Curated annotation (Swiss-Prot):
Pathway(s): Amino-acid degradation; 4-aminobutanoate degradation; Amino-acid degradation
Modified-residue entries (N6-(pyridoxal phosphate)lysine), positions: 268
Database matches in PANTHER family: AMINOTRANSFERASE CLASS III
Reactions it catalyzes: 4-aminobutanoate + 2-oxoglutarate = succinate semialdehyde + L-glutamate; 5-aminopentanoate + 2-oxoglutarate = 5-oxopentanoate + L-glutamate
Gene Ontology CC terms: cytosol
Cofactor(s) of this protein: pyridoxal 5'-phosphate
Phenotype reported upon loss of the gene: Cells lacking this gene are not able to utilize GABA as a nitrogen source, in contrast to wild-type, but grow normally with arginine, ornithine, putrescine and agmatine. Cells show only 68% of the wild-type GABA aminotransferase activity.
Organism, as annotated: Escherichia coli (strain K12)
InterPro entries assigned to the protein according to its UniProt record, in alphabetical order: 4NH2But_aminotransferase_bac, Aminotrans_3, Aminotrans_3_PPA_site, Class-III_PLP-dep_AT, PyrdxlP-dep_Trfase, PyrdxlP-dep_Trfase_major, PyrdxlP-dep_Trfase_small
EC number: 2.6.1.19, 2.6.1.48
Protein name: 4-aminobutyrate aminotransferase GabT
Amino acid sequence: MNSNKELMQRRSQAIPRGVGQIHPIFADRAENCRVWDVEGREYLDFAGGIAVLNTGHLHPKVVAAVEAQLKKLSHTCFQVLAYEPYLELCEIMNQKVPGDFAKKTLLVTTGSEAVENAVKIARAATKRSGTIAFSGAYHGRTHYTLALTGKVNPYSAGMGLMPGHVYRALYPCPLHGISEDDAIASIHRIFKNDAAPEDIAAIVIEPVQGEGGFYASSPAFMQRLRALCDEHGIMLIADEVQSGAGRTGTLFAMEQMGVAPDLTTFAKSIAGGFPLAGVTGRAEVMDAVAPGGLGGTYAGNPIACVAALEVLKVFEQENLLQKANDLGQKLKDGLLAIAEKHPEIGDVRGLGAMIAIELFEDGDHNKPDAKLTAEIVARARDKGLILLSCGPYYNVLRILVPLTIEDAQIRQGLEIISQCFDEAKQ
């Protein structure tokens, strides 16, 4: 049997250091909210492969659907020989993505591809080249999505300048002194100083920032952004790669914002652990790209498509949207109880089950505590709980449990978090 230490040594020789690894363990098998490493140790998984496992590890209905598809067809490339699961999934997404208008859907493989294609479609539809993204944003690791991403280190450090015609607005974050008025004013400054509105093809926004710290836009801000886009003929792109697929208590977070985007990207949990992503948008906008301008060899792979179709059925059969809201409330209640004993927890927040806590030195919001955050992650792992951090200051703990988690596992995870804070304080 290989140990984690031995595998980590082999990893350093075989895999470039640019591929980070948060936890120095190697997973061997998993079930719902539990993971076992190669040494047989069991962990509670509160990371979900970075928001990919809303239906848990290896949901039996998803596994059964995938096994059945594997016996029929694994790949043809949809642009060469089409297959029904791709078409069926697109038809369903056209109905489920927010917006009371005709829609079409493109399937790809990764969230980065989805965002990049959304911008490409917006540029084709508007005949413009500029894009506005936000501070703290994370949109992917391809060259263009790195330009959209509002954090240089570690994502694009040492790579030189990214593609141009990307402009940075402020994401509203009252906790850190950025009001909604500040955010809107920053867009108007772009229009005045950097790029005229008639040169902007799209504004790309995460309704709840993922890597940026789980800060959620308010419906009021999103409505102001929608009005601004309408005024200037700009496409509004909602990046729901992390917030979508039911994480926030609705299938898409934009359903809670009171307005619809022109284009929506999705990925991560949509296929229960299989690589699938997509863009859904206004039909006439999606048709702006000429034949041959969209697609990819593996885009919308049939195995991933049937997995996604089954995931959507599981959401309905197991009432997972309501469970996301119930689960989120249980997590927030438990974390708020911990925060009462630990003033270093300066904020507990989240939509649905997309929950985060933010840590500060002595509760001072001007002193983000990245060191304590990293310590809590490490202590939790030692106690059998997998957590992730995020945020521009590396001081946010995010919780991305499966929506299928058992109540006893929630209590166990919260107890471990509480113990970690108690011990770190000693």
